Amino acid sequence: DIRFNRNVLLAVDDSANARRAVAYVGFMLGGLEGFRVTLLHVISVPEEDYFARVEEKEKWLEDYRRKIESLLAEYRRELIGAGFPESLIQTRAPQRYCPSIAECILKELESTECGTIVVGRQGLSRKEEFLFGSVSSKIVGHARNCAVWVVA
């Protein structure tokens, strides 16, 4: 069953297109009654053998989490400035092992009550997109029971 509700999952990173997606959601929905936004950034945990020592991995994760929390706070402020009540904006930065970021985002979508997912389109060439696929293309192709907004 498709979910018709006013809960929006806004998957972000620090790219220009993610910033545009945040601005677009603010422009389109800010100030309207009842919309709830969850800002999501999945922290992709590197393979076990990526770091020489456990301490290096822990430091990297700590530094990266701090950077992402700052980014999510910035996006949250932007949405508040666009008219969203503070109480209706949630931030999430789960750590997951993600061979595919799109799959991890879709797993997060399943665990929420969001009827809409919003992503920024990656700036890939047609050749790169054909070879590797893009996160937004994979989300459009695999998302079920929700609306998908791709902001370019």
PLM features per residue range, with description:
Residues 58-70:
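A short acidic, glycine-rich active-site loop
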Residues 18, 98-99, 129-132:
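A conditional alpha-helix N-cap/helix-loop micro-motif detector
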Residues 38-40, 89-94, 149:
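General small-molecule cofactor/ligand-binding pocket signal
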Residues 55-60, 88-91:
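Short glycine/proline- and acidic residue-enriched helix-loop micro-motifs
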Residues 80-117, 137:
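Structural beta-alpha unit
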Residues 35, 87, 145-146:
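A structural micro-motif
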Residues 2-58, 81-82:
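Small/aliphatic-rich secondary-structure junction motif
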Residues 1, 109-152:
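Gly/Ser-rich helix-loop-strand patches that form or flank binding pockets
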